[in-house]
Amino acid sequence: KVVVIGGDNYRIGLGGGSVSSVDTGRYSSGIELNAVQRANAEMQKRANNVVRALCEEEVNPVVSIHDHGSAGHVNCLSELVEECGGLIDMSKLPIGDKTLSAKEIIANESQERMGLLIKEEAIEHVRKIAERERAPMYVVGETTGDHRFAFQQADGVRPFDLAVEQMFGSSPKTYMVDKTVERHYEMPKYELSKLHEYLTNVLQLEAVACKDWLTNKVDRSVTGKVARQQCQGELQLPLSDCGVVALDYRGEKGIATSIGHAPQAALADPAAGSILSVSEALTNLVWAPMAEGMDSISLSANWMWPCRSQEGEDARLYTAVKALSDFCCALQINVPTGKDSLSMTQKYPNGEKVISPGTVIVSAGGELSDVKKVVSPVLDNNEKTPLYHIDFSFDEQ
């Protein structure tokens, strides 16, 4: 049986996959607003609790699982029945907005939903777990074996009916042609008399002087398993190199996560920006006792780039991706997942446009052997305590 766990369908996230890949301002405001997604952390938590409970059973009743993202049910549910085909009863899908058309019901990206393929004899067992976690659960379809994927309305009309091979067959290759634009920069020359000017420029960087931590006063110990949050020391300054969460309430093991990014360096050298981003994410985990050292760590790369905005920008992205790949291969660290937003350009009616600096944000995470042995980046108020500066750049300048 095909099962959906999570919230209702709304006119949200329509065409999100396409709009996120074009310049802001290219489409009408109505189209862009419909593509906006939502966030419902409570529903996400409920659905996650159900999935976790099923995974922790001795016999997992889940045959296949897929999250809802771009293209909504079309993408999510079709992935579940790719090998055999399936029929979805649209009358069983939860509708939060009665004015939705068939297309909007099928393709909206209202998130916090999971699609699952579950054996028929396990349906009632899964339903009890969903009721316990207060997660809405709907049996919306079944596998068919005819290698077609279809949505059928209550009146028998099928607004969507395609052969599976038409959906998952080999798509045509897209070739993008760009030219490498050589840019050269002189070594900066500093004058001690301009120290305050340099300091002002550095403090304008959001990554350096953002004051959100003063206003975002939220519960930083949700679930009670947060072993290290962003504020450290007596003054509670946001100095944490990494975040740490315990795996349970009694044990010592946990998970550490950190991030790294270097958009300023990437402006001058995209390859250096990628390497520095990975380096920052990894060095932020230096003082966390990883269970198996670097073998415990996996990375996620989020590419934020203004592709096709100007000549040479696509070539810069290629250079950055290749540099990150080569660097991680040399370190023998995997990058199993990631995300991209390749339309980081804002266009205005008068023809002006603003492009974002090409950036890769690297997230690192892995298992800790002991959450209590993570070293805090807080200086000891002791005159005899040495402070070392280790220069990883090896720059003689």
Please place each PLM-identified region on the residue numbering:
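Glycine/proline-enriched, intrinsically flexible loops and inter-domain linkers
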Residues: 1-397
